[in-house]
């Protein structure tokens, strides 16, 4: 029997590309602990995240609070899946600090999906959200997607690309 070493799995992909679904599936198949940013933010800051600036401020706090704990899990042999966006080069540096700090392997799970698919999935998931929920419209998708940067070879990540049609 082969024992797999701890590994950090993290996500990259446009809004509504299917990152959260993939992260949950990955955590289950790899028997890994999963941290879901949206759930953590909702629990810690209910009703306080109304725009991009709020999201950036509060998500930075969560990353600071969790970094030590995630590295500790990894260094003790527990694989971790982070359902946090790694959608810009700057965001991906946090993940690098985690896996390098713990001395473990990593996989950047890149969910590559076209804008029209993401918008269709965004509309479907938004149907069940309360009115006024943030990040539910095509216009908001366009604003957020303008910041998206696909991973590049020079970043030196172990990229696993999942193309969604």
Residue positions per predicted region:
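Flexible, glycine- and charge-enriched loops at secondary-structure boundaries
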Residues: 52-60, 85-88, 134, 138
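Conserved GTP-binding G-domain of TRAFAC-class P-loop NTPases and closely related GTPase folds
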Residues: 2-8, 25, 29, 33, ...
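Conserved substrate/cofactor phosphate-moiety recognition/catalytic segment
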Residues: 17, 21-78, 124
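Hydrophobic anchor at the beta1->P-loop junction of P-loop NTPases
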Residues: 11
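P-loop (Walker A) phosphate-binding loop of NTP-binding proteins
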Residues: 14
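Amphipathic alpha-helical transducer elements in NTP-driven molecular machines
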Residues: 56-63, 67, 112, 138-145
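ATP-dependent NMP and nucleoside kinases share a basic, alpha-helical "lid"
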Residues: 43, 48-49, 74, 86-127
